[in-house]
């Protein structure tokens, strides 16, 4: 299991339910069924997770959009 991916997917899923400012580490742990120690073994804090999601998910989707535009 890719732990970082599990937490990033959880964050993206929780964003459909509540604003980012209201999402807690506890929410992520409940959603992923992983431990707090596991979270902190992979991320410094929630902001570190947000940066990871930005770098790995959002930037990739943004770049895929440009690839699509250039292909047309």
Language-model-detected regions and their locations in the chain:
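Short, amphipathic alpha-helix enriched in basic
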Residues: 2-24
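Short, structured secondary-structure boundary patches
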Residues: 4, 46, 59-61
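Amphipathic alpha-helical linker/stalk segments
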Residues: 13, 23, 55-72
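Helix-turn-helix
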Residues: 17-47
